[in-house]
C-alpha cells in the first residue's frame, strides 16, 4: 500500500489534525512533540521516529547528477524527491531504480500521477499544502489505491465435501459492499474471490464487515502483493478487499474467528490453464463471485459455473514471491 505523508513545515495544526484523522502514515515537522500532542502517528523530524539525514533523505532534482544521487540514496533509505518543475520523467527514472521513493506533491492531480508512474508507482507521496481539504482529498485517493487485481473467469471443474476442519472468518473494520470479497487459495499461484457476507438470507443476519474466507492453511492476498496464511492474520493487520472489477483497497482486520466446521473443496481452471482450488466451509452463506459481480453460494455451485479469481506468480517465502522451483499441489 502506498505511503501517505504530510508536510507540516511551517507548523500548521489544522493540516496535522486532518492528516491524523484521514489516516496519514507520517507527518514531517520541525518538532515531533508538536505532532505527538495531537495524536499517535509516525513523525519525521530531528526528534522524531524517523530522522532526516539519517533515516530519510530529502533531494531536490535539478539535473542528472542530483537524480543519480537520489537513486543511490534510495538503495537503502527512504528518499523524498522534489522537482523544481514537477515532471514525471525524473520519477520514472527513479522508480525504475528504487522502491523507496517518496514524491513531494501539492494536489490530487500530482498525487495520482506519482502513484501510477511506470504502473507500479512510487513508494509513497509527501503532500505539501496548507489546505486541510486537499489533505482529505489526497488521503482518499491514496487509501483507495491499494493496487488493482487482474481478475479472470475460472470454470468450476469439481466441488465436493472433504470432512471437518478449521476455517477462518475475517472480520474487518470496513463495511463491504455486494460484489466485494477477498482472494484466497490453497496455493499461491491462483486464488478465488470469496464474497463478503453482505446478502440477506433466511438463516443469519448479514455481516457486511466479514468474509468467511476458508480453511486455516489457505493463502490470502494482501495489499502489498504479498500473501499470508489465514491462520496468521491478527488484529490490526491489513488485508486486500477487491470488487468484481479488480479494484482493490485495504481493510484493517478487527478480529479473526477460527471454528471447526464441515468443509468442501472447490477446484476451477482459467482459460489460460491456471488451476485454482480452495477449501471453504460447507454452508449456504459462503459464496464465490461471478463475472457480473453476483454471488454464488457454494451449495448451488456446479461444474461449469464461472467464478472470478486471479493467477499469480507461484512460489512464496514468508509471503513474498520468489523465483525458485516450488511445487504446490
Curated annotation (Swiss-Prot):
Keywords: Amino-acid biosynthesis, Aromatic amino acid biosynthesis, NAD, Oxidoreductase. Belongs to the archaeal-type DHQ synthase family. The keyword Amino-acid biosynthesis applies. Its EC number is 1.4.1.24. InterPro entries: DHQ_synth. One of its GO terms (biological process) is amino acid biosynthetic process. It catalyses: 2-amino-2,3,7-trideoxy-D-lyxo-hept-6-ulosonate + NAD(+) + H2O = 3-dehydroquinate + NH4(+) + NADH + H(+). One of its GO terms (molecular function) is NAD binding. The keyword Amino-acid biosynthesis applies. Catalyzes the oxidative deamination and cyclization of 2-amino-3,7-dideoxy-D-threo-hept-6-ulosonic acid (ADH) to yield 3-dehydroquinate (DHQ), which is fed into the canonical shikimic pathway of aromatic amino acid biosynthesis. The gene is aroB'. This is 3-dehydroquinate synthase. Transmembrane segments: none annotated. Pfam families: DHQS. It comes from Methanoregula boonei (strain DSM 21154 / JCM 14090 / 6A8).
Amino acid at each position: 500500500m502506498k505511503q501517505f505523508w504530510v508536510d507540516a513545515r511551517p507548523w500548521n495544526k489544522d493540516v496535522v489534525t486532518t492528516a491524523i484523522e484521514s489516516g496519514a502514515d507520517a507527518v514531517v515537522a520541525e518538532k515531533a512533540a508538536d505532532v505527538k500532542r495531537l495524536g499517535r502517528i509516525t513523525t519525521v523530524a530531528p526528534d522524531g521516529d524517523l530522522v532526516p539525514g539519517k533515516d530519510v533523505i530529502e533531494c531536490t532534482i535539478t539535473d542528472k547528477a542530483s537524480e543519480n544521487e537520489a537513486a543511490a540514496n534510495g538503495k537503502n533509505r527512504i528518499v523524498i524527491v522534489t522537482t523544481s518543475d514537477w515532471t514525471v520523467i525524473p520519477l520514472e527514472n527513479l522508480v525504475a531504480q528504487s522502491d523507496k521513493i517518496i514524491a513531494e506533491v501539492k494536489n490530487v492531480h500530482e498525487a495520482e500521477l506519482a502513484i501510477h508512474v511506470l504502473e507500479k508507482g512510487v513508494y509513497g507521496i509527501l503532500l505539501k499544502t496548507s489546505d486541510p481539504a486537499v489533505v482529505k482529498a489526497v488521503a482518499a485517493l491514496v487509501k483507495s489505491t491499494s493496487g488493482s487485481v487482474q481478475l479472470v473467469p475460472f470454470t468450476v471443474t469439481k466441488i465436493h465435501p472433504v470432512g471437518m476442519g478449521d476455517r477462518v472468518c475475517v472480520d474487518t473494520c470496513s463495511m463491504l459492499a455486494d460484489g466485494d470479497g477477498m482472494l484466497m487459495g490453497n496455493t499461491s499461484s491462483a486464488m478465488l474471490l470469496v464474497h463478503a457476507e453482505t446478502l440477506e438470507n433466511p438463516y443469519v443476519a448479514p455481516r457486511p464487515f466479514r468474509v468467511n474466507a476458508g480453511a486455516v492453511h489457505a493463502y490470502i492476498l494482501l495489499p502489498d502483493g504479498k500473501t499470508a496464511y489465514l491462520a496468521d492474520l491478527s488484529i490490526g493487520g491489513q488485508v486486500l478487499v477487491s470488487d468484481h472489477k479488480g479494484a482493490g483497497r485495504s481493510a484493517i482486520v478487527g478480529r479473526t474467528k477460527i471454528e471447526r466446521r464441515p468443509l468442501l473443496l472447490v477446484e476451477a481452471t482459467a482459460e489460460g490453464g491456471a488451476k485454482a482450488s480452495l477449501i471453504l466451509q460447507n454452508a449456504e452463506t459462503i459464496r464465490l463471485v461471478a463475472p457480473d459481480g453476483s454471488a454464488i453460494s457454494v451449495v448451488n455451485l456446479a461444474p461449469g459455473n464461472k467464478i472470478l479469481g486471479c493467477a499469480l506468480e507461484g512460489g512464496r517465502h514468508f509471503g513474498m514471491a520468489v523465483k525458485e522451483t516450488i511445487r504446490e499441489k
